Amino acid sequence: MFVRALSLRDFRSWEHVELELSTGRTVFLGANGNGKTNLLEAVGYLATLGSHRVSADAPLIRSGAQRARVGANVVNAGRELRIDVELNQGSANRAQINRSPVRRTREILGILQTVLFAPEDLALVRGDPGERRRFLDELCTARLPRLAGVRADYDRVLRQRSALLKTAGRHARSTADLSTLDVWDGHLAGHAAVLVAQRLRLVHDLFPYLAEAYRSLAPESRPAAIGYRSAYLPGEFLDPARAPRDDDAAALEEIILRELAAARRKELERGVCLVGPHRDELELMLGDTPAKGFASHGESWSFALALRLASFDLLRSTSAEPVLLLDDVFAELDRRRRTALAAVAADAEQVLITAAVPEDVPAELSATPIRVATAGEAGHRTSHIVTG
C-alpha cells in the first residue's frame, strides 16, 4: 500500500499543496515550525480520522479559514482509490470516495492504513491510561474498520447513560428513570462487549510481535510484555495465553450487564459509569515491573518504539502493508534504536519521514528529499515546497 498523491487545502500551515509521491522512502526536510509534520499528520488523519497531536479537529483548520480539505490517492494491490475529507468549522465533516460523497466520514477507514512513530509516543508508556486505550482502539479499528461505528455508538451511549445517572441520582431515583437506565444498560453492554472482545484479541495477537521488537531494541533489558487490565472481567479473560473465541462478545455482554447491575447503587451515588472499556487499561510490563513509573528514559523509548514496530508487523502479516510515518524520531534515538528502525524502514513499501537536516536520517535509507519552508508575516505564515 502507498500514497501516490497527497493534496491539502487550508490544513494547518498549508494554504494549498499538491504532492506526487512514490514507493520507497521520502523525507520532508525543514526547520521546526515549517510545516513538515503537518504533512504526516494529514496522511495519518486520512487513515484514522484523528490527529496524533490534538484531540479536536478545529486546530487542523488554517487560521482564518472556514474549512480544511485533505485528500489522497491510495494504491493497494494495483487498485487505486481517491479519498477526501472536508473538515468544517461548526458543522459535520464530510468525506468522499472516488469523488462520490459517503454518508459517514468513517466509511473511508480501512482504505489507507498507517503506522506513525512520533516523539509524542513516549506518552504511550508514561502517559495516562487514555493514551493506551486510544492506541488499542485505533489499532483495533485498523484491523476491523467497522469497529469505528461501535466506538462511536459506545461513546454516545456512555454520555447519555452518564447524564441519566446524574439526573436519577438527584431526583430520588424514580421508577421511570430506573426503567430507562435498564434500557441504556443493555445498549452499553452490547457495544462494550464487542469493543472489549476486539481489544482482548488484539492484545493476544500483538504480544509476540511486541516481545520480539523490544528484544531487538534492548536485548540486555528485562523482557517486555503487555496485558489487558479490567476490574470487572473474570481472570480467565485476562490471561494473555488464552486464545480468543468467536463467542467472546456474547459472554462478555452477559458479564458486563451483571456488573452494571451490581454497580448501580454506587453509580447513582457518584453520577458516573463505573463499568466498561472506558475504565480499562493496557498494561505494559518489563519483567515483573510496570513500565509506567519504573522504566528508565531509554527503556520507555524502546517500549514505545516496540509498540509501533509490533503494530506494523502485525498489520502487514494479516492485511496490506501500512504506510510507515516517522515524525522527527531518528534524532531522538540512540544508535541501536536508529539501526533497528532503519531496518524496518528499508523493507517497507512506503515510508514518509520528517527531519530537520539530512544528517538526521540514516544514510542507508537513501530517502528522496523534499524541502519545506514558510513564507509570510508573523502570525500568517504559510508552508510551501521549495523547488529548484
Swiss-Prot record:
GO terms, molecular function: ATP binding; single-stranded DNA binding
Domain of life: Bacteria
A Gene Ontology term for the protein's cellular component: cytoplasm
SUPFAM superfamilies referenced in this protein's UniProt entry, alphabetically: P-loop containing nucleoside triphosphate hydrolases
Gene3D superfamilies referenced in this protein's UniProt entry, alphabetically: P-loop containing nucleotide triphosphate hydrolases, RecF/RecN/SMC, N-terminal domain
Chain positions recorded as ATP binding sites: 30-37
Keyword Nucleotide-binding: yes
Single biological process term from Gene Ontology: double-strand break repair
Keyword ATP-binding: yes
Alphabetized UniProt keyword annotations: ATP-binding, Cytoplasm, DNA damage, DNA repair, DNA replication, DNA-binding, Nucleotide-binding, SOS response
InterPro entries: DNA-binding_RecF, DNA-binding_RecF_CS, P-loop_NTPase, RecF/RecN/SMC_N, RecF_2
Main location: cytoplasm
Localization annotation: Cytoplasm
Family: Belongs to the RecF family.
HAMAP family in alphabetical order: RecF (MF_00365)
PANTHER family reported in the protein's UniProt record: DNA REPLICATION AND REPAIR PROTEIN RECF
Annotated function: The RecF protein is involved in DNA metabolism; it is required for DNA replication and normal SOS inducibility. RecF binds preferentially to single-stranded, linear DNA. It also seems to bind ATP.
Protein's name according to its UniProt entry: DNA replication and repair protein RecF
Organism: Nocardia farcinica (strain IFM 10152)
